[in-house]
Amino acid sequence: MPLISAPRSSAPDRPCRAIVFAHFDPHGGFDPHVTEALLRYRPHADRLVVVSTSASRLPAALRGIVDTFVPRANVGYDFGSWQAGLATLCRADFDEILCVNDSVYGPLFDLGPALRDPRTAGADLWGMVLSEQSTRRRGGRCPHVQSWFFGMRRRLLASPVYETFWNAIVPVLDKEEVVDRYELGLSVACREAGLRIAGIYDARTAGPMRLGDLWPHLSLAEPRRSWRLWKKGRRTPHNPSELAWLRLLEAGVPFVKVGLLRVNHYGLDLNRVTAALGRLHPDALPLIRGHLARCG
């Protein structure tokens, strides 16, 4: 385990911030889109920690970029990796700690405005997306900060909630239990302790998907996909990170979920999605296509 080390000197116009990046690659390497993401995170971090469950060492391109590298066994999903990365930090040194992963492409554009966004300025736990989800154990809709990008600020870092939650992380094999216990659980614990949660894109106030959102993706030439989109796309709650991807970009969220392009749960027209990304963020498209070609 790397030694706990002090942060680099923070820029005077921003909070002292650490970023813990959870990495996994099926082939054990660092994809170019991940390298690019870390390069874009670096200016916003006083300490940049990478925890990998697939690589034993950093590539040369990242050795001067990453402050701390933690290789670990592939157990415990991303929360296990964040737990290991957080253990290398003295949280009292930081105004904010971000936990992020490689399940998204991006930042596609400057992350700075999102980090200063007034919609999340007063939150103790915040993220790019706040959505609602139900699970077998919790039943009804549970508002929570989606875990692919979340930030913990001073009040949470100093709260008993922080230590109680992160000390309780243990490897869990069932993905739904991970979501229930940890992704939803962190937001629930914060709310119960009187801490505030927020998201740049808040699905509770964004409203359901409109016909105009779905219509461009419907096609008589692809009836099965179109029917899947029509049926699933109008349900609430939905996962905005994979369905409302364009709304997120327009709201200032500089990321697109990998799962949107690999799995396409809702049945969007991926040709339209990639064409739009090519228009909006042409520099990112070769990285996205390269990753999809390599990993499927």
What are these regions (language model features)?
Residues 1-296:
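ER/Golgi luminal nucleotide-sugar-dependent glycosyltransferases, focusing on the catalytic module
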